[in-house]
Amino acid sequence: MLGKIITEHGQVVNNKDIMVVHLHLKEGETIPAHNHPGRQIFFTVVEGEVEVYLDEKETYPLVPKKVLEFDGEARISVKALKESDIFVYLVVKR
């Protein structure tokens, strides 16, 4: 089989180059501030709406068809404004 359809949640890919995390957040649910040193982050909402906070200084509203890219050194926290499905791609910087 050449492809794999990913439907589970949590860390769905984790190798030396990339980690992919699939999350489901209920409305009002939050992810506390944290960072990912050594990674470039691509954060995308598949369904729903969230606010992403970087270093507690910048706020990014995200909905489907939008991708937020940022350096993993920044501290990220998240709040789900609606029930949301999210994919986060953490790429090792070289």
Regions found by a protein language model. Name each.
Residues 72-94:
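Ligand-binding loop in jelly-roll beta-barrel domains
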Residues 46-47, 63, 82:
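A cytosolic small-molecule/anion-sensing beta-strand core signal
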Residues 23, 31-36, 54, 79-80:
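Short histidine-centered beta-strand/loop micro-motifs
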Residues 56-73:
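Short acidic-glycine-tyrosine-enriched beta hairpin
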Residues 22, 42, 57-60:
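Short, surface-exposed secondary-structure edge patches
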Residues 21, 30-31, 48-53, 67:
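Short beta-strand segments in beta-sandwich/barrel cores
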Residues 38-50, 55:
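Glycine- and acidic-residue-biased ligand/ion/polar-headgroup-sensing regions
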Residues 2-32:
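A short glycine-rich, His/Asp/Glu-containing loop-to-beta-strand
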